[in-house]
Swiss-Prot record:
Binding site for heme c: C15, C18, H19, M81
Gene Ontology CC terms, in alphabetical order: apoptosome; cytosol; mitochondrial inner membrane; mitochondrial intermembrane space; mitochondrion; nucleus
Top-rank taxon: Eukaryota
Effect noted on mutating H19A: Loss of covalent heme attachment
Species this chain originates from: Homo sapiens
N6-acetyllysine carried by residues: K73, K100
Cell compartments where the protein resides: Mitochondrion intermembrane space
Residues with the Phosphotyrosine modification: Y49, Y98
Name of the featured protein: Cytochrome c
Length: 105
């Protein structure tokens, strides 16, 4: 399991320009991530997803996020997420630990 505090710093630096995590948070360029774990791809209410995201049909969890965050465009070809990914597994684990906590509060 990753480090929540390190993950928060990664989120602020690499994700917060496009995403929010708090309950009731607004969508930005990317969707609000509250309730992410256990939700199917392309399902945040009120956000306009690409068909690729909606049709991927996986459930977000630690394993799926670990793979997705390494290279989003490879994992979901056709996604509009422009983020190149996080190559270091430890950094992805830290970010996932933070997301698991922050998107469930």
């Amino acid at each position: 399991m990753g480090d929540v505090e390190k993950g928060k710093k990664i989120f602020i630096m690499k994700c917060s320009q496009c995403h929010t995590v708090e309950k009731g948070g607004k969508h930005k360029t990317g969707p609000n991530l509250h309730g992410l774990f256990g939700r199917k791809t392309g399902q945040a209410p009120g956000y306009s997803y690409t068909a690729a995201n909606k049709n991927k049909g996986i459930i977000w969890g630690e394993d799926t996020l670990m793979e997705y965050l390494e290279n989003p465009k490879k994992y979901i070809p056709g996604t509009k997420m422009i983020f190149v990914g996080i190559k270091k597994k430890e950094e992805r684990a830290d970010l996932i630990a933070y997301l698991k906590k922050a998107t469930n509060e």
